[in-house]
Amino acid sequence: MEVEVKLRLLTAAAHLRLTTLLTPYHLKTLHQRNTFFDTPKNDLSLRRAVLRLRFLQNAAVSAASPSPPRCIVSLKAKPTLANGISRVEEDEEEIEYWIGKECVESPAKLSDIGSRVLKRVKEEYGFNDFLGFVCLGGFENVRNVYEWRGVKLEVDETKYDFGNCYEIECETEEPERVKTMIEEFLTEEKIEFSNSDMTKFAVFRSGKLP
């Protein structure tokens, strides 16, 4: 079970102010492309499951020796998001980047990957293969990661086709305590925020900003 604090930054200015204040604690910047798959009848979504390929690259590595791009396949199931605290069952593993790219162009190729996560999707949701699956599209996400007050903060700028959203995420085993700590800091620094009440996937599927 993945447990995260999720707080939405209300404006681009709030995002800029926060990332500026956190500069001394910066670890890395990740450029991510999140792409989703389901059947034409949304069989996974109807059962509160999400199948995602995440393509990412670490922009903090020097230009002289750039990090290779990576691809992570993940299954998220039974999510809840209440009072800015998210709980979701998540299973993920890395696959070859080029194979992931091929699956975006031809989702049926998901059937050819010897992936533990994809095998679980078939077994738990009753699919023989992925021949009927379609690519739903996705969105870009720029994630700045910080080591701050004993926790790892992830500050996201998510770029949908219909606009941008800004969010703080923090995975923790003490969500209430960590949420209070972050909220007090944001309030003290006059950074506008609210509890996140929709996942990024839900925003993407809604086609409009929250």
From Swiss-Prot:
Subcellular location: Nucleus
Biological process per Gene Ontology, one example term: root development
Name of this protein: Triphosphate tunnel metalloenzyme 3
Domain named CYTH: residues: 1-208
Organism lineage: Eukaryota, Viridiplantae, Streptophyta, Embryophyta, Tracheophyta
Keyword tags: ATP-binding, Hydrolase, Nucleotide-binding, Nucleus
EC number(s) stated in the UniProt entry for this protein: 3.6.1.-, 3.6.1.25
Gene encoding the protein: TTM3
Example of a GO cellular component annotation carried by this entry: cytoplasm
